[in-house]
């Protein structure tokens, strides 16, 4: 089980990312657009640097929905490998069965 403070901090980061997402996309579009001038690019870079670090989606960590485990995360289920196995054996994941060949 992950510390509650780590889980809370990650949720706070998700909120910050959502709050700044539209503005970050606009600034990145200015940087990507070939028609933008050098001054526009520099201004966009400067504004991106002024934003909080936690506004970057890279800082958000995928965590298990049950216990917050950060490693061994499977996106399809939103669970770590440990909890995926437990849930599958208990029959709580429809359509998931133990492999045999």
UniProtKB/Swiss-Prot annotation:
Pfam families: Ribosomal_S14. The keyword Endoplasmic reticulum does not apply. Keywords: Ribonucleoprotein, Ribosomal protein, RNA-binding, rRNA-binding. Residues 38-53 have a biased composition (Basic and acidic residues). GO terms for biological process: translation. One of its GO terms (cellular component) is small ribosomal subunit. The keyword Endoplasmic reticulum does not apply. GO terms for molecular function: rRNA binding; structural constituent of ribosome. InterPro entries: Ribosomal_uS14 (IPR001209), Ribosomal_uS14_bac/plastid (IPR023036). Residues 31-67 are annotated as: Disordered. Belongs to the universal ribosomal protein uS14 family. NCBIfam families: PRK08881.1. Part of the 30S ribosomal subunit. Contacts proteins S3 and S10. Binds 16S rRNA, required for the assembly of 30S particles and may also be responsible for determining the conformation of the 16S rRNA at the A site. This is Small ribosomal subunit protein uS14A. It comes from Streptomyces coelicolor (strain ATCC BAA-471 / A3(2) / M145). The lineage of its organism: Bacteria, Bacillati, Actinomycetota, Actinomycetes, Kitasatosporales.
């Amino acid at each position: 089980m992950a510390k509650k403070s780590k889980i809370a901090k990650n949720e706070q980061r998700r909120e910050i990312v959502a709050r700044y997402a539209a503005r970050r996309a606009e600034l990145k579009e200015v940087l990507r657009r070939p028609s933008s001038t050098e001054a526009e690019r520099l201004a966009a870079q400067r504004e991106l640097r002024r934003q909080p670090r936690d506004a970057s989606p890279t800082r958000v960590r995928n965590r298990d929905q049950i216990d917050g485990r950060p490693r061994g995360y499977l996106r399809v289920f939103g669970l770590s490998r440990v909890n995926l196995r437990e849930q599958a054996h208990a029959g709580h994941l429809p359509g998931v069965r133990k492999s045999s060949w």
